Amino acid sequence: MFIVSGDWDLRGAVRAELREAGVEALGLETVEDTARVIAGGIAPSLVVLDGAQLHNSEMRRALENLSSRVPVLVINSRLDPAPPLPGTTTMLRPVQIKEIVARILAMLLSAS
């Protein structure tokens, strides 16, 4: 699983809570980082994505391709939301870390 966000606090907190739940996750800062890791042979079971990453049209195209293959959870802003990405699940800020983790665990369960 990948946690993709430029916000270190979000990445770190979600990863820590997932680790407590027995789920390992890789924290990545950008979609470019995600592409490099996938090109290196690591495939995610699920991607949690900060919606701010979707404002860039090039990043959007890369993520549309990814979202057709793996579940994607977008954490989006209420004030400046990114356009919806087809095939993804969206949560709007403000949202608590435990709510994000609960949604991730539910998505992993339904995907298996």
Description of each model-found segment:
Residues E29-L46:
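Acidic, metal-coordinating helix/loop segments flanking the phosphotransfer/catalytic sites
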Residues W8-L26:
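Two-component/phosphorelay signaling modules centered on CheY-like receiver
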Residues V48-A52:
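Active-site residues of response regulator receiver
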Residues L10-G12, R36, L54-S57, D80-P84:
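Short, charged/polar "capping" segments at the starts of alpha-helices
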Residues S57-R69:
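Short amphipathic alpha-helix used as the core "switch/output" element in two-component signaling
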Residues V4-G6:
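Conserved acidic carboxylate
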Residues I75-S112:
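Output/docking surface of receiver
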